[in-house]
A protein has these predicted regions:
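Active-site residues of response regulator receiver
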Residues: 54, 82
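Active-site beta3 strand of CheY-like receiver
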Residues: 46-52
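Short, flexible helix-to-coil linker/hinge segments that flank and couple to helix-turn-helix
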Residues: 88-95, 99-154, 196, 207-209
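Acidic catalytic/metal-coordinating carboxylates
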Residues: 35-38, 59-64
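Short amphipathic alpha-helix used as the core "switch/output" element in two-component signaling
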Residues: 41, 63-75
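Basic, Lys/Arg-enriched C-terminal extension of HTH/homeodomain DNA-binding domains
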Residues: 187-210
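Two-component/phosphorelay signaling modules centered on CheY-like receiver
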Residues: 12-31
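Helix-turn-helix DNA-binding segment
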Residues: 135, 142-178
Length: 210
């Protein structure tokens, strides 16, 4: 039986290319999404065998979508697609629960291998990032983890995308007061004093594109 896959990437041309690649290899693409929120809704509906998420997506990034997936469908492994080779992105992805981490530049050759591995219950890292992960663990303790919770990252991403507090509340289904409270805690944790500083942090963490 063909492995059933959910694709999530905000660039339609990328999704089309990935879909063509996977269908050529005999996989079944059961859904396509342009952001993390759409991906989670489709995942609940289609219950794929494997989910492939872009790391940087609007409204809800791949990192937090992955973390949500571990609760929504704990048996469905997630492969993250990204251009980032820096260890902070890789470790954040693994902490979020990703089972695979594939560089977009290597997707044509490595995505199929990643899907096969995670579908069997294993993990997969693109060869180019494996060394970074090894070095990161050797240097364990030198780099602080992201101080923000998953919800705070979601709020931060929306703020960095230019959303008002009211718009953040609508997107996340929370009250305006709660959204404002999250914003205040984020600024306190990051010792930031303005939206520009929050945008810079979001870019550094790969939550939005520069």
């Amino acid at each position: 039986m063909a492995i059933r896959i959910l694709l999530a990437d905000d660039h339609e041309i990328v999704r089309q290319g990935l879909k063509a690649l996977l269908e050529q290899k005999g996989y079944q693409v059961v859904g396509e999404a342009a952001n993390g929120h759409e991906a989670l809704k489709l995942a609940a509906k289609t219950k794929p065998d494997v989910a492939v998420f872009d790391l940087t997506m609007p409204l809800l990034n791949g990192l937090d979508a992955t973390q949500e997936m571990t609760h929504l469908l704990p048996k469905t492994p997630v492969v993250l697609l990204t251009m980032h080779t820096e260890e902070q992105y890789i470790l954040d992805a693994l902490r979020a629960g990703a089972r695979g981490y594939v560089l977009k530049s290597e997707a044509a050759t490595n995505l199929v291998a990643a899907i096969e591995e995670v579908a069997k219950g294993s993990s997969y890292l693109s060869p180019r990032v494996s060394r970074a992960v090894m070095q990161a663990y050797l240097d364990k303790g030198k780099r602080a983890e992201d101080p923000l919770s998953s919800r705070e990252r979601q709020v931060l991403q929306l703020i960095a995308e230019g959303k008002s507090t009211k718009e953040v509340a609508v997107v996340l289904g929370i009250s305006t007061k709660t959204a404002e409270s999250h914003r205040s805690r984020i600024m306190e944790k990051l010792n930031s004093h303005g939206t520009a500083a929050l945008v810079r942090y979001a870019i550094r963490r790969g939550l939005i594109e520069p």
